[in-house]
Amino acid sequence: MAAKIKKGDKVVILTGKDKGKKGDVVAVFPKENKALVQGVNMVKRHEKPSQTATGGIVTREAKVHLSNIAIQDPKTGAPTRVGFKTLDDGRKVRFAKASGETIDG
C-alpha cells in the first residue's frame, strides 16, 4: 500500500498532549507505524558526556503514531484524510478528501 504520510508533509496532531499542533514530518518509520514531527512530542533525555559532546539533559522530538497524525489540508489548513487518484497523464497522486486539492504533483 502506498504511503499516505511522507517526509516533508505538513501534519496536524489529532490526540495527546500536543493536540492541535502543526509541524513538518522529519522522518517516517513504516515498520513501526510512527513518524517524527518537528517540534512535537518533545521529551527530555539524560545523556552522558562523551569526547565530542557534553552531557546533560537534552530535549528532542519523540516518534508519534501515524493514527494520531493527519495531513494538513493545503486549502484550509484543517486536518484531512488522504486519498489517491490517477491523473490524465497516468501519475498517481495524493489528494485531500475534504477539499479535493492535490497534495503532491
Curated annotation (Swiss-Prot):
Pfam families: KOW, ribosomal_L24. This is Large ribosomal subunit protein uL24. The gene is rplX. One of two assembly initiator proteins, it binds directly to the 5'-end of the 23S rRNA, where it nucleates assembly of the 50S subunit. Part of the 50S ribosomal subunit. The lineage of its organism: Bacteria, Pseudomonadati, Pseudomonadota, Alphaproteobacteria, Hyphomicrobiales. It comes from the Bacteria. The keyword Coiled coil does not apply. Keywords: Ribonucleoprotein, Ribosomal protein, RNA-binding, rRNA-binding. Belongs to the universal ribosomal protein uL24 family. One of its GO terms (biological process) is translation. The keyword Oxidoreductase does not apply. GO terms for cellular component: ribonucleoprotein complex; ribosome. One of its GO terms (molecular function) is rRNA binding.
